[in-house]
Amino acid sequence: GLMTEYEIWEFLRTNPKEASVIETMGLPDSVWLGDNDSTKYLYYYVEQIQDYNLIEINSSTNNVSGFEWD
């Protein structure tokens, strides 16, 4: 079923691989690459807050390097 916000936060805090993020969270609504391609930004639209949450992926390791999840 759906994960709670806390479960999502706990999951992202472990710096999982991008494939694991997509498997767990589903496909992002939008993906952007940083200027030097070192970071990939996955945006997920959240209906409740009418805004996007962001997950940063390090392009060389493919691990989560940061996130903003409200």
Regions found by a protein language model. Name each.
Residues 1-70:
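Residues within mature, well-folded domains
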